[in-house]
Amino acid sequence: GQGDAGGYLNGNYEYIKKRIRKYLEYSPQAKRMGIQGLVYVAFTITRDGSAQNVELRTSSGFDSLDESALEAVHRASPFAPPPHAARVVVPIQFSLK
């Protein structure tokens, strides 16, 4: 049941966030304008590890950051396959540090 997906997420949440960050591209325009923000993206990791139904849960308020966040999830796919499809919500931080 859901218990397995919970275990998968507990063990892999940091890995999932790191993997997405690896594929995150800060648009040069957003960088130039000093735009920063936090985006929450929701998606399902299917049993073969692919990201499906990727959607914006909470916007950063900037289209370019929102788009980059969604793209990063698609590029980071596939992830380590879960025992059952798992729905994930991941915060993606854009900061110019």
How would you describe each model-predicted region?
Residues Y8-V41, E67-K97:
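Short proline/glycine- and basic residue-enriched helix-capping loop/turn segments at helix->loop/beta transitions
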